Regions:
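Glyoxalase I/VOC metalloenzyme domain signal
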Residues: 1-40, 51-95, 111-245, 256-274
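Ferredoxin-like iron-sulfur electron-transfer modules
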Residues: 100
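Short, small/polar residue-rich loop motifs at catalytic or cofactor-binding pockets
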Residues: 103-105, 250-252
Length: 274
């Protein structure tokens, strides 16, 4: 990896945080589960915003929020105000208008036409996650849609996404054209060498789109890498979380987890295909 900070072009998911009724309890849970260390980035007198660091690199954050707790995914945009207008024009909903997050950046809360909520992030001093794709760090955020065809149309219109159908256990992989070139030129110069056996275009992949099942609502799902799914499941349960489901995929062993305050996320152990 390069020493150049990781930056995120328009349309690339760039950050995750979780809103929790008891942020300090959440910090204890996630700190033990993933090895995160926390510092408060909020100015004096403001509600705490706990930045989680992994090996000194920004990985995620915890903020105060109502029950049930939830995870949020932020997607990078060049202009948050314009992206909000485009979201509404494409049939989405604006849940909170653009607002400055101090010098860190500018953000807004929106939802797609199926109700899946996500955040927009126009970077200032904080471009997004610096710890990604290693154990304890964010891997991907996936969209689970009630109508994948309509969801494809919405996100393509908003962000210019393309989709790679791999014929495996996911509906399609989300790709941002040119993202691999951006990574190769900045924070990840070995990306193509490292992904030599991956499907064509995989260097542009930023997430996956799946169909919901069993009456599940449309939502964005945060996926965090772990070295050992079984060990991480056991730790999560010991700390009061619930394992909702497991899924053995070609490239990963997954488990859906509900944390002690109700926020759901997925852990992912990478494995080489047999």
């Amino acid at each position: 990896m390069s020493d150049i900070p990781r930056t995120y072009p328009q349309g690339v998911p760039c950050w995750i945080d979780t809103e929790q009724p008891d942020p300090e309890a959440a910090a204890r849970f996630y700190g033990e589960l993933f090895g995160w260390e926390f510092s408060n980035a909020a100015p004096p007198g403001a509600p705490a915003y706990l930045i989680a660091a992994l090996d000194g690199a920004d990985a995620a954050a915890i903020a105060a929020g109502p029950e049930p707790a939830r995870w949020n995914t932020y997607i990078a945009v060049d202009d948050a105000d314009e992206a909000v207008r485009q979201t509404a024009d494409a049939g989405g909903s604006v849940l909170a208008p653009p607002a400055d997050a101090g010098p860190a950046g500018r953000t807004a809360s929106v939802a797609d036409p199926q109700g899946a909520e996500f955040r927009l992030w126009q970077a200032g001093r904080r471009p997004g996650a610096q710890a990604v794709n290693w154990p304890g760090a964010w891997n991907f955020s996936d969209i689970r849609a009630t109508d994948t065809v309509a969801a494809r149309d919405f996100y393509t219109r908003l962000f210019g996404w393309r989709y790679l159908d791999l014929g495996e256990s996911v509906e399609s992989m989300i790709a941002v054209p040119g993202y691999g070139d951006h990574l190769e030129a900045t924070a990840d110069p070995q990306i193509r060498e490292r992904q030599a056996g991956a499907p064509e275009g995989f260097e542009d992949v930023v997430g996956a789109m799946e169909a919901t099942a069993g009456g599940e609502r449309a939502h964005w799902r945060v996926k965090i890498s772990v070295a050992d799914r079984a060990a991480s499941m056991a730790t999560a349960q010991r700390l009061g979380a619930t394992v909702l489901a497991t899924d053995d995929q070609v490239w990963a062993l997954l488990a859906d987890i509900r944390d002690p305050q109700g926020a759901e996320f997925t852990i992912s152990e990478f494995r080489e295909p047999a």
